[in-house]
């Protein structure tokens, strides 16, 4: 189980409505084209792979006083770091408000790792190449967006590095609220639609509140976002902004997992008919086996299982072949599977309920969790544990029991759950005659499992339980 845990699902989205000034356009071009059009280069000597040092990413002084080549920062996930001259170039850019350049430097630095940090499946998803530009451009003309990006990015790093968020970001937070209130008075007067960029800022406030464990505030902002979407004409008006829509739904789903509240967008999505049909089932080779294991299970649950199983097969193939799926497919599967599962109701302690919660736990690890910081969902975790305790029986196939326990371990359970989880896993591993990690992998893969997302933590859990085996 992971060591860094926070609640909720903050967003990182942006969209451009105006053209930035020439200096910023020049900066963006250099940022996006970094590493391209270099011509033939000499082969470089192999260097020892350095360990990611996130503290340097979050240190404003580094970004203004020394180039990335002098630190480990350029090795963080992406291979296209911000140019070494970022400090001097920032001094020529006119931002939407007077701010300390060092605070903006952290935002720009984070923009180079944002997708990788927030989407474990990033290497398998085809995001727009212009996303990096869309991160930067609004900083020049939208003051609310500028201040929002500053306080959300800095507080993200504070939590990631186990630092108590300080008061240095408070002025940016209050400035955002002030600007947003003034803007909503103008945009919400009925003469014009609330802009997508304004919706992005409201979503950021909701995500930040969840990050800071302020649920009431997060709910308030999400309710405001729902009103904005209704004023714009519904969720269909965001179809051209798939990335923003993904983040809206991730935040909505994350709140439901954290508190058990009903998602705010369920009624829109579940009543939208054909627009939320299940995707065509992806081809898999294990339908016969699943039909046997899930005999007597609700038909819609079995269909949901097949959709997720096929999606996992597709992602594993993409990871192996180094290809990508459209982000719209990620959005469609996430929405159609997770909102339906949350809307289903079965008897407490029933096999249907156990499978529903198992699929939700698995889906949360695929669609909601982050790469460097694992979300904590106390309500759902307790609900799943209780259902496991009530429902897991000796006549259930041990392989299915193993999958259900491991899914919880890699998605929602924490170190506090090890006391009851590890002995149970030890017993099931013995029943399945598991001796090596590859033995466990084979069983998990026969159900559904994404190595890119689950293998690292899964191996840690296996090693931990194996050590328990030796000491018993």
UniProtKB/Swiss-Prot annotation:
It is found in: Nucleus. Its main location: nucleus. A motif (Nuclear localization signal) lies at residues 24-31. It comes from the Eukaryota. Keywords: Nucleus. Transcription factor; part of the gene cluster that mediates the biosynthesis of the phthalide-terpenoid hybrid 11'-O-desmethylfendlerol. This is Transcription factor mfmI. The lineage of its organism: Eukaryota, Fungi, Dikarya, Ascomycota, Pezizomycotina. The gene is mfmI.
């Amino acid at each position: 189980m992971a060591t860094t845990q926070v609640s909720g699902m903050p967003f990182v989205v942006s969209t451009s409505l105006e053209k930035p000034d020439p200096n910023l356009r020049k900066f963006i071009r250099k940022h996006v084209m970094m590493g391209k059009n270099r011509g033939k280069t000499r082969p470089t000597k192999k260097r020892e792979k350095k360990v990611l040092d996130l503290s340097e990413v979050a240190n404003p002084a580094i970004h203004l006083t020394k180039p990335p080549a002098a630190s480990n920062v350029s090795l963080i996930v992406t291979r296209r770091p911000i140019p070494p001259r970022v400090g001097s170039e920032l001094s020529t850019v006119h931002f939407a408000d007077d701010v300390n350049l060092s605070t903006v430097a952290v935002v720009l630095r984070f923009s180079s790792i944002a997708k990788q940090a927030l989407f474990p499946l990033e290497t398998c998803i085809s995001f727009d190449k212009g996303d990096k530009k869309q991160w930067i451009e609004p900083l020049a003309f939208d003051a609310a967006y500028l201040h929002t990006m500053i306080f959300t990015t800095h507080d993200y790093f504070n939590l990631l590095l186990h630092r108590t968020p300080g008061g240095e970001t408070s002025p940016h937070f209050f400035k955002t609220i002030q600007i947003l209130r003034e803007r909503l008075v103008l945009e919400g007067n009925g003469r014009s639609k609330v802009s997508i960029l304004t919706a992005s800022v409201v979503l950021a406030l909701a995500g930040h509140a969840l990050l800071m464990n302020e649920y009431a505030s997060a709910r308030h902002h999400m309710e405001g976002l729902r009103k904005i979407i209704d004023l714009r004409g519904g969720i269909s008006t965001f179809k051209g902004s798939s990335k923003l829509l993904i983040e809206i739904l991730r935040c909505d789903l994350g709140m439901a997992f954290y508190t058990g509240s009903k998602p705010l967008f369920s009624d829109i999505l579940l009543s939208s008919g054909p627009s939320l049909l299940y995707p065509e089932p992806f081809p898999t080779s294990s339908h016969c086996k699943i039909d046997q294991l899930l005999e007597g299970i609700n038909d819609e649950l079995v269909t949901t299982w097949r959709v997720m199983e096929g999606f996992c097969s597709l992602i594993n193939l993409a990871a192996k072949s180094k290809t990508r799926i459209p982000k719209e497919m990620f959005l469609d599967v996430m929405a159609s599977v997770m909102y339906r599962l949350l809307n289903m109701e079965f008897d407490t302690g029933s096999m249907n309920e156990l499978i529903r919660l198992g699929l939700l736990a698995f889906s949360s690890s695929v669609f909601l969790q982050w790469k460097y910081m694992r979300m904590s969902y106390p309500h759902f975790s307790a609900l799943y544990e209780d259902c496991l305790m009530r429902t897991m029986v000796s006549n259930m196939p041990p392989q299915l029991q193993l999958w259900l326990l491991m899914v919880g371990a890699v998605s929602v359970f924490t170190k506090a759950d090890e006391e009851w989880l590890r002995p149970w896993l030890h017993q099931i591993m013995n029943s399945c005659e598991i001796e090596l990690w590859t033995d466990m992998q084979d069983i998990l893969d026969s159900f559904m499992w994404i190595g890119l997302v689950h293998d690292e933590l899964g191996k840690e859990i296996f090693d931990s339980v194996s050590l328990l085996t030796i000491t018993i």
